Every structure is written in C-alpha cells, then in structure tokens.
Amino acid sequence: MNPTPDDDEPRNPVRMAPMIAVVIPCYREARHVLDVLARVGAEVGRIIVVDDACPDGTGRLVRENCKDPRVEVLTHDRNKGVGGATMTGYRHAMELGAEIVVKLDGDGQMDPAMIPELVKPIAAGEADYTKGNRFHQFLALGRMPPVRITGNMLLSFLSKLSSGYWDVFDPTNGFTAIHAKILRALPLEKISERFFFESDVLFRLGLMRAVVKDIPMQARYGDEVSAISIPRIIPEFLIKHYLNVCRRVYYTYFVREFGFASIQLVVGKLFMLFGLAYGIYWWHDSTVTDIPATAGTVVLAALPIILGSQLLIAFINYDTRNVPRRPVHPLL
C-alpha cells in the first residue's frame, strides 16, 4: 500500500530550540568583558552589550576587539544604573525576536557555561523566570566575602516578604533568564533602575503569579570592588521593600482574591490593635492613679492580642504556601 502524505510526516516532531539572547549591562567592566564574551556558548543567538556610560569605554573596547558576529553594543549617553542598562537590553532583545532573554553581568563572576542550565526550565515550560543561587552549595560559601553573606541573608528575607517567593533565595543575584512573553507583560517603565532592580523584578513577577526557579551556581570572586555600599542601600531597600509588601498584600488578598486568609489578616490586625490600645490605656491609667489593673482588665487586653497573633500566624502560614506553581507564559 502506498503511503499517504500524512504517513510521511514525523509522528513526534522535534521541538525547535528557542532563540536565546544574552544581555550584558556594563559599567567599568573593561578588564573582564572580553573574557566573558569569549565564553558565551553557541546556544546563544544574540549578545547585547549595554555600555551604561562607562568611563573606561567598555563599549568601545568591545566594538574594537570582539569579532563575534552575535555581539551588538548599545551605548547610553548617561548612566542609568544596572536596571536601566538591563532594560535597554531587554527591549532590544524583544525587538530581535528573542524567546528567552538571559542577563549576564560583565564582571566575570558568573560562568556563561551555565546558561543552558538557566534556560532549560523555561524552555521545558517548567518556569517563567530562573535565577542563580550562590547559597545552594554550602562549601562554596567559604569563597564569598562575609559582608556579602550577611547582606544577602537580610535582603533575601526582605525579598521573600515583598515578592511572596518564600522558596527563593539570593534575590540580588544578577544571573537570570526570563521568557519573552513574561518580559513583554512586565511594566518595565515602573521597575527600579538601580540596585533594587532584581528585587523589584521579583515583586512584579509575584504580582503576575509567574513561576520562579532557583538554579544552583558558584560565583567567582576576584579583586574587583563592589559598587554596592551596604550602609547606603539598606535604608533605601527597607523603604522600597516595605512599600512592595503593602502593594503585594493588598493586590493579592484584597483585589485579585478575597478569602479566609484575607479575613484572618484583617481580623487579626484589628484584635491586635484593640488589645494593645486597651492595654496601654489601662496601664497608663494605673500608673497615674497608682491603682493596679484588675485581673479582668488584664485578660481583656491580653486575649485579643493572643487571638490576633494566632490569626496573623495563620495568615503568614497560608502566604508562605501560596507560592506560584503553574507557569504563566504558556497561557499568554
């Protein structure tokens, strides 16, 4: 019997590899950027170097010395910060038709050979956004400066609160990958352009219910000096994380849905506030009149605080389990 046209078609067509673009924001990276570019593998289709008004002429150095046809250099007239440079690269990558966009720093601390591992969960439809995690391997922490370990522990906890990704660590890690559909849905014009960039992206992804996955990695530390001043960024990060916590809780539990967790939060806060206000009032009264508060007064102040704290603990328990599990980009 002669085969029909349908018989000639493959039963299990091979899925084409996604077009991957790498964005490398640069500021004072002339010492390392050429080595980083040389180590980017063949799986990457385009490489976008963004010169963020570098005083050392990183962009010019790449143009003059890198012959890789995949490399394109964009230049800022003024410094916009790591976030601003990255988003310039993101926009250009989308214009080029990239399906997955990787952010890779130009300081040599990240191994470009790990790009396939970073991209794999997104290409397989298991995640919308992936990021490196330098804390996954305990022995590797010995090579991390102590100030970075301490700072990352604090920033990771704040990021968990503001983003809702309780299973994600190392939020300031700049080795990331994102699906282009998710990237198009992000309000890039609202995202912080400076050092808060990565944490702000996680917050925006949390509002979208995008799936974020950590990828274990090792960072290489040389003699480069970090541009981040911990004493300077801590107050800024505290304020921005606090605002993002308020926005996330309001949108997640009072706009997008309203359930038992929302009630637990509202009632728990009311009970706590009432108990504290009532207790403070009678404590002040007893100090002025020198008359001890009665047992009933103490119980009436303590009981709402106890009940309120239990309700708030129940809300936090629900929130920590309310981490997105279903990737969003296949639905867009």
Model-derived regions, located:
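Hydrophobic helical membrane-anchoring modules
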Residues: 2-15, 190-192, 196-332
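Cell-envelope/extracellular polymer assembly enzymes that use nucleotide-activated donors
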Residues: 19-21, 46, 200
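Short, well-formed alpha-helical segments that are part of the catalytic scaffolds
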Residues: 27-43
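Acidic helix N-cap motif at the loop->helix transition within catalytic regions
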Residues: 31-35, 56-65
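Short beta-strand/loop segment that forms part of the nucleotide-sugar
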Residues: 37, 45-54, 74-75
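A conserved acidic beta->alpha catalytic loop
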Residues: 51-60, 78, 108
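Acceptor/aglycone-binding surface of glycosyltransferases and processive sugar-polymer synthases
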Residues: 72-95, 100, 112-195, 221-232
